[in-house]
Amino acid sequence: MAARSRSAKRARGVGTGVAIACVLACGGVQAELLSAYFPPGVPGYGEAPGVTVLSRARPEYENPGTRLGSFIVQPRIEEGLAYDSNVFGSANPRGSWIVGTHPSLLVNSDWSRNSVGGYFSLDDWRYLDQPQQSRTNWSAAVGGTLAVGRDQLSLAVAHLLLHQDRTELDALPSDTPVAYQVDDVRASYTIALDRLSITPSLNFTTYHYSSTTILGAAAPQSYRDRNVLQAATTARYELAPQRNLVVVIRALDSHYTEPQLGQPTRDSTGYQALVGIADDADAMWRYHVLVGWELRDFAASQYQSHQAPIAEAALIWSPSGLTTVTTTLTRSIEDAAQEGIAGYTYTRARLTVDHEYLRNVLLQASTGLQHADFLQGGGQDTAFLFGVSATWLINRHMRLAATYDFTDQRGSSNPTLQTTGNYTRSIGLLTLRFGL
């Protein structure tokens, strides 16, 4: 497990400054994908992708952390200065300078067999020209794994206080960011049977939203409060070393705890089935591809059942030791923020190119698409994304990152859909990170 711990630290190494830019620039349902908020190394949450140019080991530029017994402690702080050209995502843009502060603490065991990891982070953004848009997010998680013979038990718990910005897909045109709280508990048990492994898992997540205002009028958000229970089974069969056939079966139950008076409940049950291959055997081509189908049944007769093809895919191409090209695709059915709309089909595609210009100068360019197709005739939202970044690894403790992100979002003209609408937005960010 020591090797796993060290690789987790390496995977976290470069991307933090870029991730902070994404907090400002990226919209959509990412806010509810919990793994996006925790680094690799937190059992149950952090998911390390295949090694890319940005995530590969660079011992001379990695901050080693501080050893406390059998634990490695990594405190970090980042300071950023940004400019957002369209804070409100409107046709008449208003910009603002932003000062960001991001302290974090990652703690990992360095045991040979089992593992424990914890993470705490805070994101504070001060909008100098639009102070009412300032917000502070924080998140904390702890998880662990326990080896039981050849099997493995994984347990994790997390608490997050976040804000939904009005520029996100499916977001309401609120006067200020909508605060919401997420609590999550998850457990899984991997049964190893020679070349076959079976992992049953159980996740329970609660969402609680604070009230906001729209054009100065009170807009309670408690109708979005919900409890989500997910049970899943994942089977992996080893076709060859580092090449696996994967089958995933999931059942989901969403229960809204504060339904609107006079409105049908948005409670639902969902069923997902995916099949695919995870192949990490080739140094040049690595891919994880799952495709399948999802059915969503709603408790209220006013909402028709909905079904759609779904996918979870990632392809990494390494044409040379200095460049990697990563393509990702996700498609799923999500719960909606809009009143009277039970959900939407969400599609996200992204292409990212990472290049090592020098050993300590790393470049990245990406383009992407996000699309939300709302149920009950609620219209559509589409966002086109483009971004570039450069990271200078100064030494083992300091690095400087510059990022630029552009968003072009096109919303439906359907009057029942309360979203921001059409807008373009540019964000430039300069971040200095210091870590021990």
Q: Model features per residue range: what roles?
A:
Residues 1-48:
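Cleavable N-terminal export/targeting peptides
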